[in-house]
């Protein structure tokens, strides 16, 4: 039998039918639903007189529009309130395996909530009307975002039409140095291959450095696969995966668990499997990263200086660099560790899990917010993450440092709720996109790890966390 990649196995086991042009009908196991991309899909079902094909495939929560402060006042923005209320109404009418509404303890960012509930399992196909659905590939699952029309199609038929991507293996060999996190690995890779480097591919991450990562770190890495242009990212199943899933609310139990684990252990690329493209990186080469421009590929080590567009020979790239520097209000040659910040945001589906908050708290402990920093928002990814952080006393560390301890939600990752930047504000952010206006009109976003964000909060500028005793 021909050796198969992990992607081959996941894809082939879910093909319902294939056409001559390579288009397939792909079966979907788990459909994650939130308030932004579902209203039109539910409306389409109503107009056609259809029901959900498989109610028990749907897990839902509200996240993009929910406020992260003043919950006693409810949702103040009328459009946001309408979207959340509409989701409530639609789930009540159509049903779901589980629904975590606004202010429920289980509510949170869909890509944090799904895994912590055991709704994401190895071997699954997982879709959501959100581009960062690639997060769930950390479990040895095939996961990617879909558009609103596909959301309706999945609801009605449990399938989507798709064409198989090419396969890419990105190996990170060796051990990561102290202070280097999965976020740094992701940004480093994007800096090396570019935001179009993964276009048309499904990426499998492998190598010693990847195998040593926790599940939460693997989720961070796969979350960022879309920023490299890939359709999906994934990590092979190992004991770390199985240990994380065990005893989660929606994980199998008893004999079903044993059978599942037996199958899950096959979800690795076979020895001798051929990938369409491969990259190998050395973990020793990766330092803490900071983006300087308006694309995740505009990223450098913290010890670097803002690059000079005049040194770029490609005229298109040079023009892009010039525009980015103008928007970001930066001058070529400025050391990254001399750039001051106004706002710090620690949260998002990339970095709002308990390990992320622990990293940030370790830096913030016994320190205070720098005088030039206007606000530091700490936004847990779910009510359960918030509860665990408070059990560990992390909230007290943040509050004593002068940070804001918020309620769960997508928050300042995107300007769709009350948490947003104003024109010219510079933000150290643990989110995933630094596009123009992403965090608010005229806002300037620098992507970093949770520890690097916390360091910026207490020093007032980008700082190498390895220099902080």
Swiss-Prot record:
Keyword Isomerase: no
Keyword Metal-binding in record: yes
MF GO annotations: 3-isopropylmalate dehydratase activity; 4 iron, 4 sulfur cluster binding; metal ion binding
Cofactor: binding details: Binds 1 [4Fe-4S] cluster per subunit.
Superkingdom field: Bacteria
Residues that bind [4Fe-4S] cluster: 349, 410, 413
Pathway participation: Amino-acid biosynthesis; L-leucine biosynthesis; L-leucine from 3-methyl-2-oxobutanoate: step 2/4
Catalytic activity: (2R,3S)-3-isopropylmalate = (2S)-2-isopropylmalate
An example Gene Ontology biological process: L-leucine biosynthetic process
UniProt KW keywords: 4Fe-4S, Amino-acid biosynthesis, Branched-chain amino acid biosynthesis, Iron, Iron-sulfur, Leucine biosynthesis, Lyase, Metal-binding
Swiss-Prot/TrEMBL cofactor(s): [4Fe-4S] cluster
HAMAP family: LeuC_type1
Record text on subunit structure and interactions: Heterodimer of LeuC and LeuD.
Purpose of the protein: Catalyzes the isomerization between 2-isopropylmalate and 3-isopropylmalate, via the formation of 2-isopropylmaleate.
Descriptive protein name: 3-isopropylmalate dehydratase large subunit
Gene designation: leuC
